[in-house]
Structures are given as C-alpha cells and as structure tokens.
Regions:
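Glycine/charged-rich beta-loop-alpha catalytic/anionic-binding loops adjacent to active sites
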Residues: 4-11, 72-76
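Flexible beta-alpha connector loops of hexameric P-loop NTPases
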Residues: 8-17, 50-57
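Amphipathic alpha-helical transducer elements in NTP-driven molecular machines
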Residues: 16-23, 60, 92
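A structural preference for short, pocket-lining loop segments at secondary-structure junctions
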Residues: 1-6, 21-49
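Conserved catalytic cores of soluble enzyme domains
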Residues: 36, 40-111
Length: 111
C-alpha cells in the first residue's frame, strides 16, 4: 500500500478528507497484511479544521494508532521523506520501521 502527501496541495496538510483516505488505506493494509510505503512531504494537520481532523479513532490520532498496531503485527512500514515533515507529520516516519530521507531536501522534527 502506498500512502502519500503532496506538498504542492495545501502544504501536504491533513484535512478531514485527507485523513479519512489515509486511515482507510491503513485499514486495507492491516486487513490484508500489506506492507506500507509512506511518501511524506507533510505540514501536519490543518489546525483550522482541528475539530474535524483530531476527534476520534477514524481521524488523525487514529492513523498513529494504526501505525503502532501494524508494527506490533509485523507489517513492514517504510517512510520516504521528500521535504518538510512538521508537527503530526513527523510521527509518520518516527513510527515507521525504516526511513529514507532525501539528502539536503528533507527535515523532520524527529530527535
């Protein structure tokens, strides 16, 4: 399964619709034990839609839960970071099994 953010569209931020697609792709990957490749160039959640992006298991926090659940189940997750990786977007590579970052083009808030 490939899940991607596009920084040329609203900075790659997660909106209500974006996170629903992200979570649905994770559910399909989990149900079918498919490896996941995240293509990350993300500005995190769109804070102006916080009440629609964060609230429950099918929203932003649920994506992180699903990453942890897949990791515990042995489903490989690889993050390829192509640019910014700020706020909640930094958790995607941090929770992945392997991370590939483009030299001099990638930054993550991960310590």
């Amino acid at each position: 399964m490939i899940i991607a953010n596009d920084a040329t569209t609203k900075g790659g931020s997660f909106f209500k619709e974006t996170i629903r697609k992200h979570v649905r792709a994770q559910d399909i990957a989990f149900e079918n034990r498919l490896p996941v490749i995240y293509l990350v160039d993300c500005g995190g959640a769109n804070l102006s839609q916080g009440d629609e992006v964060f609230p429950d298991q099918d929203h932003f926090g649920g994506a992180f839960y699903r990453q942890c659940r897949m990791s515990a189940s042995g489903i490989p997750q690889i993050a390829a970071v192509f640019g910014e990786c700020t706020a909640g977007g930094a958790y995607i590579p941090a929770l992945s099994d392997e991370v590939v970052m483009a030299s001099l083009a990638s930054r993550s808030n991960r310590n």
